[in-house]
Amino acid sequence: MFAGLPSLSHEQQQKAVERIHELMAQGMSSGQAIALVAEELRATHTGEQIVARFEDEDEDQDEDEDD
């Protein structure tokens, strides 16, 4: 799967991590916190985008089991 992701500086990445930790400290699950911060970043980011490829490890394991 390919996805367009915001290209973030180290400082922006650090702020995102801190925001995730704040949300988790308030009782939000890690998955929800990550999703919310990702949504916020996509909505407000005006810089460059990078393309990333994600591979589903489960699919690879399923294929290995079929052999």
From Swiss-Prot:
InterPro entries: UPF0181. This is UPF0181 protein KPK_1966. NCBIfam families: PRK05114.1. Residues 48-67 are annotated as: Disordered. Residues 55-67 have a biased composition (Acidic residues). It comes from Klebsiella pneumoniae (strain 342). Belongs to the UPF0181 family.
